[in-house]
């Protein structure tokens, strides 16, 4: 609690700052009229507490905060500038009638229902009439104070101030527009950056998947090339057995013709050709059989080289034919050597000096390697007949003569 300040006696001196504070608060709380005592209480509270109710002053003077003012000090100071009795009369006067340019207001001419009842009553007093007059006069004044009015300032006195005020408003408007445009641009950039980020995030997994697929395909191609390079050459018999047991999965090209799997079984025409060749070999001498073996081995070696270049299906068919031809020729040679009729037939064949059908067949096969790939083709059949059938006819005629 702060120490209680001693009230000053009458005739207290007032500084400039204290007088300014007095008139400042007197504008809000007039110590005159009916409510002058209530207004004086509020005015003394603000004068004695400058820290709680400060006032901005042009000069740097500060009043002493040790002073305590009373109501008598304030009345004495105000009596130097105003006539307090006249001030009370003016403050207590009723509001005068308010007239517009066109005449008295509507409120002065019209009467409310309550006013009509008061006028009609014979027992109405003068006090009631005075109250009605006060109401009629106060209402238009309140309306007048609440209305907005236009006014003009003289250009000579306030022209420069008005120009500066207008320029300041223009500058502020321009700044506000610039800031608004900058904010809009920043928002647009932020939205665009967010969209680009979302697109990049969505594209990244796709690119990763593409890269992974490309890497997998490259690795598969490299592995396939390495396997092709590292696989050793396989003999004809092994390749035939492997191809017969295991199906080969080859990549299908759109430009190449679709391959059809060839069967390894012998057709009737092939079986007839084999029987005819075996009969011809039985007619030949024993000495020529070894030459035929050598020729067959030589022919098989030549055929194996050409068969490697041809397709896998052609290799299957040709290998089986060569093996069967060699086996049957060896069996026929042994039988002809043991039988007595075979020796006679060998002598006849030596005298006749017939051409070797096997060599002709091998030469024809070497000249036309494409027929090996397609055993059942009509061209292959016609050539086989042209090579083998004449020899078979000669052998059958010789047998008939014997």
Swiss-Prot record:
Subunit structure: Component of the NuA4 histone acetyltransferase complex.
Gene designation per UniProt: EAF7
Bias-annotated ranges (Acidic residues): 116-128
Family: Belongs to the EAF7 family.
Disulphide bond pairs: none
Pfam families named in the record: Eaf7
Major localization class: nucleus
Physiological role: Component of the NuA4 histone acetyltransferase complex which is involved in transcriptional activation of selected genes principally by acetylation of nucleosomal histone H4 and H2A. The NuA4 complex is also involved in DNA repair.
Annotated Polar residues bias: 219-233
GO cellular component terms given for this protein: NuA4 histone acetyltransferase complex; nucleus
Protein's GO biological process: chromatin organization; DNA repair; regulation of transcription by RNA polymerase II
Keywords: Chromatin regulator, DNA damage, DNA repair, Nucleus, Transcription, Transcription regulation
Name of the protein in question: Chromatin modification-related protein EAF7
Basic and acidic residues: compositionally biased ranges: 172-192, 203-213, 281-311
